[in-house]
UniProtKB/Swiss-Prot annotation:
GO molecular function, one term: rRNA binding
A cellular component term, taken from the record's GO annotations: ribonucleoprotein complex
Protein name listed in UniProt: Small ribosomal subunit protein uS11
InterPro entries given in the database record: Ribosomal_uS11, Ribosomal_uS11_bac-type, Ribosomal_uS11_CS, Ribosomal_uS11_sf
Length: 129
């Protein structure tokens, strides 16, 4: 007796109207994560994972490419509105927001969530170049 082939069910992508874009812009890299309102990650992309290595990773253009890749990945969820949370002092802060805006998302809110110590840990020593 032949077995009937088991068909895998297609996973239905849930439709989400608005989400949150978390941008972590350090001096060396930029990480873009798009989540739903509860914080469940829908897609993420980095400047390093987008093909940039070394010092090119820390450029505004690399951050822009990472944002475009992340935006392309969440299009299937039907995302329309984005709230943007920016963390860090890196060069990719502004270009990432511009890229998300150009990708067709309506940016409702931009918040800077860079952690500021209330005189916490001792900072690293100053660079001598």
């Amino acid at each position: 007796m032949a077995k009937t082939p088991v068909r895998a069910r297609k996973r239905v992508k849930k439709q989400i109207a608005d989400g949150v874009a978390h941008i972590h812009a350090s001096f060396n890299n930029t990480i873009v994560t798009i989540t739903d309102r509860q914080g469940n990650a829908l897609a993420w992309a980095t400047a390093g994972g987008s093909g940039f290595r070394g010092s090119r990773k820390s450029t505004p253009f690399a951050a822009q490419v990472a944002a475009e890749r992340c935006a392309e990945a969440v299009k299937e969820f039907g995302l329309k509105n984005l709230e943007v949370m920016v963390k860090g002092p890196g060069p990719g802060r502004e270009s990432t927001i511009r890229a998300l805006n150009a990708a067709g998302f309506r940016i409702t809110n931009i918040t800077d969530v860079t952690p500021i110590p209330h005189n916490g840990c001792r900072p690293p020593k100053k660079r001598r170049v």
